[in-house]
Amino acid sequence: MSPVVSERLLSFDNRIVNQEELNRIGINLDFDKLDLSLNLSLSRDDARQNQFSFDVPYEKPLYSEAGLFSWHNIFNLTTNYIDSELDTSQLDWRVEWISNGNIGGYQGLNLESSVYAVPDELNLDESMKIYRGDIRAFVDRPEYPLRFTIGDITPYSAGHLPSTTLGGISMERLWNRLQPTRNIKSGGSQDIYLVESATVGVYINGTFYGDIRLPPGRYSIDDLPLRQGDNDILLSIRYQSGRREEITYSQFFNTRLLKKGFSDYGIYAGVISEVVEREYSYDTDQTVGQLYYDYGLTDSLTIGLNGLYHNLGQIAGFSLGIGTGDSNIGFRGSILSYSESQESDSFGYIASIDFSTILWGNLNSSSANFRSSFESFYDYRSTPWQTEDDIESGNRGLVSYTYRLYNNVNLNTYVQVDTFQDPVRYDITGQLELEINYFGFDVTLGIEHQQNYDLVTSDETTYYAIIGWDWYSDDGNYEFLAQYFTRENVTRATFNKYSSNTVGSYGYQLNAERSDILQSYEARANYVGNRYSAEIDVSRFDDNEGVFTANSVSGRLSTGFTMVDSDISWNRGYRGPTAIVSVHDSLEVPVHINEFIGDSPEAIATSTLSNSVPLYSGHSSSSFDVSIPDAPIGYDYGSGYYQITPGTYTGHVVHVGSDEAKTVIGSLVDINGKPIGLRNGIVSGEGVTRSIFTNKAGRFAIDRMKSGTFKVTIIGKLQYTGILVIDDVDKNLIYLNPVALKEVLP
């Protein structure tokens, strides 16, 4: 409450205050006749304003004890049966083994690898083909922070540097991974690498464009169905092992602003690597060195340098980021050198300026509604050494503006102009959209004009509409989505029942899509078990002309295996740091992990077979709970709450239950039978030391005890000593006869 209200309350002193007096100072007190309760609330003007900031000071984490050796494994099995009129293999399958490990704790050696097996269709003498994915080893130094990596690496593409994949070494200052709780206003890499099979949901500018089922591999954002210019993209990735991830980015250049005094950099060196027919190829004739360095001169000004060396081409560039309140300006410039003989000059350049701000018509939204970008390039090729690509000169400019008429009505405009030299050509694209959102309905009405001047001149105007309805149940477990796209005359409907990450959870999805070309139907169901997850889907594709029909059935199974020193567990597949929950032999009932009211547990461990719980984020604190609903009466297994700060791939072991799980209740008396009340002391023996307290009647209760003989010492002005015996019985709640103590004479 505000200080004024506090002072008025104090002025009432100790007298009785009626409801009207409380209402006058902004305190509302209402009596609920249904449940006989009092509801107390403050008026808005009299409530104290609390300020919350995510810019909290960084505190160096206190890392938890980890195993010397940890090994995390995910095993995925995928089978597909296709019945079609095309001459293709009907039965297909794939086995995936994704492995991560750590030796030596959070500052030790981390390992990443993956191995896959598929039918060998080219070699009839062998039944399967085994190939690998990216393999790398790295060491973290989170206090700096720095990561040193050797193996298959993907450098961060700063400025105009191309996206490359190398076999080599790197040194990176990965703030967001090694110090994830520190706020430096830094962005992250936008590369996409799927280490295991996944279903990728594609959302572009808020519109769902469908799911793509992808096997493990490297994928470029250029492979997605994006339009030129402004694209706000969300990739919702659902891995086969059950892990989920979301990647969001914009096709506009994202200016990186660092806090004053903070730097971010990466240094990479190696040879070009390519994956051809699932085989890794390292071209030792193509050596690459790449680096970037960004530094925050002030909180609103960041400068950067970047460069790349290749024996057939080099790039040197700079970047400048300026933040001015609601606006951001980014400058990038690069000079390119080509070493091979060619008709054009041996040097080229590219310069870009990107601007975003909040303009009139943004209502109360804090996101930028005006974006513009201009780029000029001369004798430019994005990857200098790829001589098969053309060298181009020209300019590119685009402007995007959103006018928010109401909270649910937007007017979007977009214009892009591309001009090229030698030969002279240009492309102009203009777009105007009216977007209306109302009670789950999303209606977009648009007009697009495209004009191209090349060897063939074209001028086309298109009118289109996108109509959708998205419904969620109140509990968020069910969704129905219906969409219609006039451009391709596509109608799509999807009904989802989402599963949760708990034992026994299940989900399903029904999809139907129809267009002028084809129609497709799909039914998918998934189940989350205690130590595995499974998914099955059935689909059908029909060519509307009756030329092609295909039916397919797919099944996917995922499980995991974790080892930390000598402890092992069978669990669902988890990537990242993990804690094994090991149950003591004295517990013959299951232990539930992360069981919340009204939900099933996320996992169940038993004394015969341990289970694991993911810690999700390395170098920051993670917590989980264990509970034992069927625990024996009196069995003490502690608070059940565990908090662990892991490294990137460290493994941890939590022991639930022990021999010291008995609860003992009794009383202390002196040799005359008089209660020793309101006293404290120590109970020790059998390797156990516990505190003891008595009430006025001399009664006490001690938890976490074991069977055996113990010495009782009562301290204070009058000291007592004696022996307490706990018999070896199966019961965990034990009531003792009065324990007689002798007074210790001075």
Predicted regions and their residues:
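Short, acidic Ser/Thr/Gly-rich low-complexity loop/linker segments typical of extracellular
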Residues: G598-N611, E686-R699
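Short Pro-Gly-centered beta-turn/loop motif in secreted/extracellular proteins
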Residues: L224-D230, S607-D636, T648, K696-K711, ...
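Short, ordered, surface-exposed loop/turn motifs in non-cytosolic proteins
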Residues: S586-S600, D670-G687
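Outer-membrane beta-barrel channel domains
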Residues: S2-G261, G317-T324, R332-D389, E522-P590, ...
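Residues that define the transmembrane beta-barrel architecture of outer-membrane proteins
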Residues: S89-V95, S127-Y131, G261, D285-G289, ...
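Structured interaction patches on ligand/partner-binding surfaces of diverse proteins
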Residues: E245-Q251, A603-T606, D630-H652, G716-V744
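Outer-membrane beta-barrel "beta-signal"
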Residues: D459-L481, A493, S552-V564
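Repeated loop/turn-to-beta-strand initiation elements of outer-membrane beta-barrel proteins
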Residues: I103-E112, E143-F148, A198-V200, D299-G304, ...
